[in-house]
């Protein structure tokens, strides 16, 4: 059983849904990211998504694009992110997902990257621009290393796509709540709960919902239907305003509030 499966199983036993938090690795630098991950876990995050910065993040809105730019400007590389995860594994067993685009993995080499990521203590990869039908090579590599490979579903995914993702994915399935790019929204889509319930019925893996969730109230609303809630852009915005100890304090307070929202939605 993977760390991710273990975490979802223990949450299910307690009748809780998962809070998944996203931050960009290396924003503003990797030393800060290390402290941030530990603070996110302390404040209530159940899983951590670390964004791999990329120069052309087509699925991301301006908040995460700017975060990616800051991380690249500080010299963040894929090998350095793996070194960060290795350091974190000396301090925490929180499940860590690397989320990003296929180009940096392709440049690194899929098999070598999967091996190195597993050795570092990464639990899963989520490659935004790699659909199941193009993922055979990476899937083989992750399977051989014991890494989960997470795929996306969207509001426009049909039955065959849902079946394909259910067959090939592991860890959990990530449901994108809205079409378009990442970014905080003022409200959750009216039909989200019904659609999530429908999709969830076709899956054995946990279904987490992300894109656009920015308040504890929205997190609770989504948690009523899903197995977990992802918050990204709303967290990343704090990196534009704060730094150092104040950044950690602000992030911790916000994540604690999000966790309370998720707990309310779990009941």
Swiss-Prot record:
Active-site residues (renumbered): 49 (proton acceptor), 60 (proton acceptor)
Keyword Lyase: yes
Enzyme Commission (EC) number: 4.2.1.20
Cited InterPro entries: Aldolase_TIM (IPR013785), RibuloseP-bd_barrel (IPR011060), Trp_synthase_alpha_AS (IPR018204), Trp_synthase_suA (IPR002028)
Reaction equations catalysed: (1S,2R)-1-C-(indol-3-yl)glycerol 3-phosphate + L-serine = D-glyceraldehyde 3-phosphate + L-tryptophan + H2O
Pathway per the UniProt entry: Amino-acid biosynthesis; L-tryptophan biosynthesis; L-tryptophan from chorismate: step 5/5
Pfam family, one: Trp_syntA
GO molecular function terms listed in the Swiss-Prot or TrEMBL record: tryptophan synthase activity
Keywords per UniProt: Amino-acid biosynthesis, Aromatic amino acid biosynthesis, Lyase, Tryptophan biosynthesis
PROSITE patterns: TRP_SYNTHASE_ALPHA
Keyword 4Fe-4S assigned: no
Enzyme class, broadest EC rank: lyase
One annotated Gene Ontology cellular component of this protein: cytosol
PANTHER family (alphabetical): TRYPTOPHAN SYNTHASE ALPHA CHAIN, CHLOROPLASTIC, TRYPTOPHAN SYNTHASE, ALPHA CHAIN
The protein's role, per its UniProt record: The alpha subunit is responsible for the aldol cleavage of indoleglycerol phosphate to indole and glyceraldehyde 3-phosphate.
Family: Belongs to the TrpA family.
Known partners and oligomeric status: Tetramer of two alpha and two beta chains.
Annotated protein name in UniProt: Tryptophan synthase alpha chain
Gene giving rise to this polypeptide: trpA
